[in-house]
From Swiss-Prot:
Substrate binds at residues 81, 220-222, 271, 387-389. Its cofactor is Mn(2+). Binds 1 Mn(2+) ion per subunit. GO terms for molecular function: GTP binding; manganese ion binding; phosphoenolpyruvate carboxykinase (GTP) activity. One of its GO terms (cellular component) is cytosol. This is Phosphoenolpyruvate carboxykinase [GTP]. PROSITE patterns: PEPCK_GTP. The active site is at 273. It comes from the Bacteria. Mn(2+) binds at residues 229, 249, 296. Belongs to the phosphoenolpyruvate carboxykinase [GTP] family. Pfam families: PEPCK_GTP, PEPCK_N. GTP binds at residues 272-277, 389, 420, 515-518.
Amino acid sequence: MTSATIPGLDTAPTEHEGLLAWVREVAELTQPDRVVFTDGSEEECARLTEQLCEAGTFQKLNEEKKPNSYLALSDPSDVARVESRTYICSEREIDAGPTNNWMDPAEMRGIMTDLYRGSMRGRTMYVVPFCMGPLEAEDPKLGVEITDSEYVVVSMRTMTRMGQAALDKMGTDGFFVKALHSLGAPLEPGEKDVPWPCNDTKYITHFPETREIWSYGSGYGGNALLGKKCYSLRIASAMAHDEGWLAEHMLILKLISPENKAYFIAAAFPSACGKTNLAMLQPTIPGWRAETVGDDIAWMRFGKDGRLYAVNPEFGFFGVAPGTNWSSNPNAMKTIEAGNTVFTNVAKTDDGDVWWEGLEGEPDHLIDWKGNDYILRETETKAAHPNSRYCTPISQCPTLAPEWDDPQGVPISAILFGGRRKTTVPLITQARDWQHGVFIGATLGSEQTAAAEGKVGTVRRDPMAMLPFLGYNVGDYFQHWIDIGKNADESKMPAVFFVNWFRRGDDGRFLWPGFGENSRVLKWAIERIEHKADGRSTPIGIVPTAQDLDLEGLDVDPEDVDAALAVKPEEWRQELPLIEEWFEFVGEKLPTGIRDEFDALKHRLAEEA
């Protein structure tokens, strides 16, 4: 079949020649039955969800409990990002760096072109125009995803500003990121489809110089919703490096003091370390309020006043379900309860609602994420997959900040780095200056979670929580962070803090209650910015004492707070060779400034001996 005979190609609602040529090229290669240009309308979404229900991909949930919401159960082999099959195919291997898989781009294009050949046969090819961040931005970042997955189209409508408005923004010659996705599951005439088509062979490939994404074989969110990690972090980080800004794996939180002064905080935590919970914080300190700007990604650019301004490029939440409940994150629950949500790989109750581990109430009987009968307490397996998700519109969040859609972004007062560490790292530490803050982010370590492949529980270095998402060499990335500070007025730069909500006592208990009580820790950070709070100088930075924190009304053992804030030089001396090992892995591109900070830390720890 030539492109001339594929229905839908001749009715494109655009005169963008570059886009039309690409669509024709992909259609000729992948051989779909038809081509559809998506418009993002309610009618289109309703039509696609009906199709997905008929195909068995979606199960309609109880309309009274979860209005206009659906459950999808994936193939058991397609449940998470596949870091082992994710590539940065820069022209030079050194530009991908040691943290990324690399292949020569010409070789990769050859392999994937062969895989794409005929891969959409029997399916519809959707052309999905989208914008990351507000459409009215000075420099809107546009993209087009071509996909053969209705699940992807529906999810992209939730997660991005998708449809005709984005297409119109491109005009006749505007630049856009090309994002090509195929499930790799062609259908022969008369062949019955499966509810979750995918392929055992998977590639998620990025070409940073040409700003292209090619994904094959997976229908799962992070591998298939190409506006998310692929564009917003991997390709955008390469763009940011070239253009002098930052594309980061960070939530954006608005904290409002009793004096009604607003502070915006960006925070980088690895997956499943409480990012969404903090983004939707409910402060427990009287008079303080919090609002949400974003829960996962922040793009930070300098404003005309010399400060860093952040936008959330996303339009929805793609959150981890297990552990989300009315106690840990009531605002996430309210967002989900409002409806219009797609759940993936959670369990289903007998009355057509959803359930996952950590949710209040334990039904006697469930259908688990594999579609099997499940009796709680009779098995050690999980009813919901540990990386099961909800995909829901950000506009439904009850604590959404009015500035969330501001094309200028919001001015960032503080940047937090944090991971999941049982020992060593105190509840909060303030960096001495910008470069010291970059060192803290560059050496961030966290225990492995279920959001990625690999052994759960082992500590891995996750610089700025960007390890799986860097679009270029990690050493160049650290230098870019240092340069961002060098080229700015440091007095206008955000203060940098290092937090750890997860420290445990010798008996294995969490020392800090976390969740809403984290507002007490953030209050200290804000007061440090305002020069109103004390802290003690330690070898690792400025750390508060228990007396420096507002603990009024908190029922917690004072000894636990002291232990959560403790800086133990002997533990940090054990950390030094692990950092050294990490730097050896980073290799020759490790910036001198980072090495200088490490040497200074060693010196300060030696003085504590």
